[in-house]
């Protein structure tokens, strides 16, 4: 995920996955497909170098399919899974996690639910039991539910002065006016969420139908299979949850301004993107590096910041949800510089769209993107994130070991085809939150 737009989706989706498609390992990652005794499939990277185990799990179905009167219920349900389970109330559960020196968390995104577990090898059986009880026997007690709802209500007030929230809301409302992606929580929806709603949401989402599991670390295939059954074996077979329709972003709005009293303005700009199964996905990683994904080597950073000093930083990257895809960019600047920063950004995008990239730029991008992938695989936690991202995106099990070659195979013609397809500034909506001078 590029820094300004960390999107959960699957743990892979959006730019998180692009980062792992934009870089490549210098060492093989031995990913093995295992099947537990009860028939649940998982991907395993067995490595005893470090005495720890990392597990990631993902289920399709997130906040985009919530009932319209219960927006926010999926996220609250995810939070409540670690607020007491089985015989342990919220305090006892958290104390047990601390005693085991483990981490366990659940999260909800637009299109799915995720679980993350990290444990020392010596505590792994007890850690797997904690995950089992959280997933299968959550208490959904009244006190932590009331506390979480109070926190969310406070958040409703603070978000109205959060530039990122306001900008992304404006974008989603402009691009997806009648789609669930434009919905947000409200005081009414939070008030309506009760224990029964949490029970229903858990039952609707947690089953084996869309479950995807990745395990990395100090554990054998046999023990990993038993761990999978310990945690997930009691889940019903279930069915894939209903999904919202695919949506094409609405026609671009050249400029949307949201006034917010502050000395700086946040600028977001988005245009139509592509899904990660598109043949142009990997060339897009190279093209994006050239436009705005390559830090100080990118064209936008050079022209908008280095040459003119108009922004503190600027970057771009793909943003993929299950039912829509975008190219997103962001910048932050002084209110007096917003107009010129947008003009220069549009002009540089237009120049790239008209003239294309150079062979030298493509070579530099490929060198960086392939060379830096090792940094994405230098710990068990990172390996789990990368491999699980590919798994959730539907990649084959060997993808992590062959993506270097895919990146290196990208040609100048490939990159310029993507640039012509996706980087036309006339297709982008710009949103400004702040008090930009001369813009309304």
PLM-predicted stretches and their roles:
Residues 63, 268-272, 292-333:
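A structural supersecondary motif
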Residues 17, 159-207, 228, 315, ...:
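Scaffold signal of the M16-like zinc-metallopeptidase fold and its non-catalytic homologs
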Residues 1-10:
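Bacterial N-terminal signal peptides
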Residues 55-121, 161, 180, 184, ...:
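M16/MPP (pitrilysin/insulinase) zinc-metallopeptidase core fold and M16-derived inactive scaffolds
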Residues 17-18, 181-182, 207, 212-275, ...:
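An aromatic/glycine/proline-enriched structural segment found at the starts
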Residues 83-87, 118-149, 294-295, 315, ...:
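M16/insulysin-pitrilysin zinc metalloprotease superfamily fold
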Residues 17-24, 212-216, 331, 363-440:
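C-terminal regions of mature proteins
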Residues 151-169, 250-265, 306-311, 322, ...:
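Short acidic/His-enriched helical or mixed secondary-structure segments at domain edges of catalytic enzymes
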């Amino acid at each position: 995920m590029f820094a300004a737009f960390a999107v959960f989706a699957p743990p892979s989706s959006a730019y998180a996955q692009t980062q792992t498609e934009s870089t490549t390992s210098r060492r093989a990652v031995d990913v093995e497909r295992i099947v537990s005794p009860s028939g649940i499939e998982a991907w395993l990277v067995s490595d005893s170098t470090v005495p720890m185990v990392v597990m990631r799990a993902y289920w399709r179905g997130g906040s985009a399919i919530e009932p319209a009167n219960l927006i926010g219920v999926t996220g609250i349900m995810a939070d409540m899974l670690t607020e007491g389970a089985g015989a342990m109330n919220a305090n006892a559960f958290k104390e047990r996690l601390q005693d085991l020196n483990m981490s366990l968390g659940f999260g909800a995104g637009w299109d799915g639910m995720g679980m993350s577990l990290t444990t020392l090898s010596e505590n792994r059986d007890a850690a797997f039991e904690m995950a089992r009880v959280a997933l299968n026997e959550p208490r959904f007690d009244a006190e932590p539910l009331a506390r979480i709802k109070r926190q969310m209500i406070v958040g409703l007030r603070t978000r109205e002065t959060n530039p990122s929230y306001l900008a992304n809301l404006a974008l989603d409302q402009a691009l997806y006016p009648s789609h669930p992606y434009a919905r947000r929580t409200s005081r009414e929806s939070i008030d309506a969420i009760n224990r029964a709603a949490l029970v229903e949401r858990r039952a609707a989402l947690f089953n084996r139908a869309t479950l995807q599991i990745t395990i990395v670390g100090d554990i054998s295939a046999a023990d990993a299979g038993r761990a999978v059954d310990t945690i997930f074996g009691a889940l019903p077979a279930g069915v894939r949850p209903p999904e919202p329709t695919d949506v094409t972003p609405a026609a671009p709005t050249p400029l949307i301004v949201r006034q917010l009293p502050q000395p700086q303005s946040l600028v977001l700009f988005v245009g139509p993107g592509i899904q990660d199964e598109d043949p142009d996905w990997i060339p897009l990683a190279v093209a994006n590096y050239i436009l705005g994904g390559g830090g100080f080597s990118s064209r936008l950073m050079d022209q908008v910041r280095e040459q003119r000093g108009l922004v503190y930083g600027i970057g771009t990257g793909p943003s993929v949800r299950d039912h829509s895809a975008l190219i997103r960019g962001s910048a932050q600047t002084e209110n007096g510089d917003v107009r010129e920063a947008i003009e220069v950004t549009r002009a540089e995008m237009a120049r790239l769209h008209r003239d294309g990239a150079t062979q030298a730029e493509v070579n530099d991008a490929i060198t960086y993107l392939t060379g830096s992938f090792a940094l994405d695989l230098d710990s068990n936690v990172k390996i789990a994130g990368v491999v699980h991202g590919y798994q959730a995106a539907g990649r084959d099990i060997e993808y992590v070991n062959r993506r270097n070659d895919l990146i290196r195979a990208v040609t100048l013609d490939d990159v310029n085809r993507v640039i012509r397809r996706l980087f036309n500034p006339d297709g982008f909506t710009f949103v400004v939150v702040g008090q930009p001078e001369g813009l309304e």
